[in-house]
Design a protein with these regions (language model features):
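All-alpha prenyltransferase/terpene-synthase fold signal
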Residues: 1-114
Length: 114
């Protein structure tokens, strides 16, 4: 869940909010969940063009904007909420403790990437 949230923030937040340069995952051609889901939704011709542009390092800001405005983002958010929900359910079996409370809060925070 943490990695998915980080991938979302790389596309959706500002550099001031995240404390890092945005779009670095795309610039480094990292296969993130948002990228994978977005590519799967594209027609084949557009998918090949996007992959070519990514591998050449061109049009990164445009591709980041396309991903962030696509239906893929809703899908990725849904997957993130699912993982956080699963984590919360697993925590119910643990005895009450400060660690359990901290993990529960972490799952809650991670489920809201913006």
């Amino acid at each position: 869940a943490f990695q998915i949230r980080d991938d979302l923030l790389d596309l959706l937040s500002t550099e001031q909010q995240s404390g890092k340069t945005l779009g670095t995952d795309l610039a480094e051609c990292k296969l993130t969940l948002p990228l994978i889901v977005w590519l799967r939704q594209l027609p084949e011709k557009q998918k090949q063009a996007a992959i070519k542009n990514l591998s050449e390092g061109s049009q990164i800001p445009r591709i980041a904007e396309q991903i962030s405005q696509s239906p893929a983002m809703q899908q990725v958010r849904k997957i993130l909420r699912k993982f956080c929900g699963q984590a919360s359910r697993f925590l119910t079996d643990l005895p009450d403790s400060a660690a359990k409370e901290a993990l529960s809060k972490l799952a809650e925070i991670l489920s809201c990437p913006e």
